[in-house]
Structures are given as structure tokens and as C-alpha cells.
């Protein structure tokens, strides 16, 4: 085999279909667009969601709710993440950021009760779920709202 004999693998290269290039191509004359009408014109077509003049679905459905601009976004920390700290440690939001356990803290940290905690820790955070408080205290630790 020589360099000039190299061929691409069968089926790896697809020839671009050149439309509107003669009747013999099978895609000449109207170039696969049919006859006349809005969709046959250059730049023609209807916008997404257009239903032929019928009131579209997005206008038939009522508006619901609103976005609260004062919403607080808490960074979530689960119990199984707290297991990486030594027993007796005071886990604060600053410590969590320092150890790169959490990042992008916007309005504070909320501790949730997902996973198991088997060390007694003093956990300080902005919010706690009821199950997290129960699990931390069951492990002999304390919770404190900052």
C-alpha cells in the first residue's frame, strides 16, 4: 500500500447533497421545497409555536406564579459530607469554604439530613432541616444557627 492508495473507510464520508442542480439529480427544479407557498420562498417559514392562525398553546394556557426577587439561595451540605471532619470539630461556614467542601456560597449554608453521620460535631450553619438536627444530636453533636 502506498500513500496515494489510501482511501477513507466505507461510509465515513457522506457526499453533500447539492439541491437545485438539474432534474437528473432527483433534487433539481424546486430543490425539495415543493410548489410555491410560504415555505417554498427564500427565508420563508413560520415562527416556532405558530399554529396556522389558531390561538397557539402558549397563549391558551394561563400564566401562573411569579419569581420572587428576594429569594434566598442556600448552599446545600449533606450529613455524609460532614463525616470528613474529625470528631469534636466545630464545623462553621468559614471552615467549609476553607476546606473547599462548598463553593459559591450566596446567602448561606443549609444542612440537610441525607446520609449518615457517625461523629460528634458542633455544626454552625444558617439553616438546618429537622432530620439533620435529629441526626447530628443523635451522634452526640450540637447544632447552632449562625
Swiss-Prot record:
Keywords: Ribonucleoprotein, Ribosomal protein, RNA-binding, rRNA-binding. Residues 21-31, 42-52 have a biased composition (Gly residues). Residues 1-58 are annotated as: Disordered. PROSITE patterns: RIBOSOMAL_L15. Pfam families: Ribosomal_L27A. SUPFAM superfamilies: Ribosomal proteins L15p and L18e. GO terms for molecular function: rRNA binding; structural constituent of ribosome. Residues 1-13 have a biased composition (Basic and acidic residues). One of its GO terms (cellular component) is cytosolic large ribosomal subunit. One of its GO terms (biological process) is translation. Belongs to the universal ribosomal protein uL15 family. Binds to the 23S rRNA. Part of the 50S ribosomal subunit. This is Large ribosomal subunit protein uL15. It comes from Shouchella clausii (strain KSM-K16) (Alkalihalobacillus clausii). The lineage of its organism: Bacteria, Bacillati, Bacillota, Bacilli, Bacillales.
Amino acid at each position: 500500500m502506498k500513500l496515494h492508495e489510501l482511501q477513507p473507510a466505507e461510509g465515513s464520508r457522506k457526499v453533500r447533497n447539492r439541491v437545485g442542480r438539474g432534474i437528473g439529480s432527483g433534487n433539481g427544479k424546486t430543490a425539495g421545497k415543493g410548489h410555491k407557498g410560504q415555505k417554498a420562498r427564500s427565508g420563508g417559514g413560520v415562527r416556532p409555536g405558530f399554529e396556522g392562525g389558531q390561538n397557539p398553546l402558549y397563549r391558551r394556557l394561563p400564566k401562573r406564579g411569579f419569581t420572587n426577587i428576594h429569594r434566598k439561595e442556600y448552599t446545600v451540605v449533606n450529613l455524609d459530607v460532614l463525616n470528613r471532619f474529625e470528631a469534636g470539630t466545630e464545623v462553621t461556614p468559614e471552615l467549609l469554604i476553607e476546606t473547599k467542601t462548598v463553593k459559591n456560597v450566596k446567602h448561606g449554608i443549609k444542612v440537610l439530613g441525607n446520609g449518615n453521620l457517625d461523629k460528634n460535631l458542633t455544626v454552625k450553619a444558617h439553616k438546618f432541616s429537622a432530620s439533620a438536627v435529629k441526626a447530628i444530636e443523635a451522634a452526640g453533636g450540637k447544632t447552632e444557627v449562625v
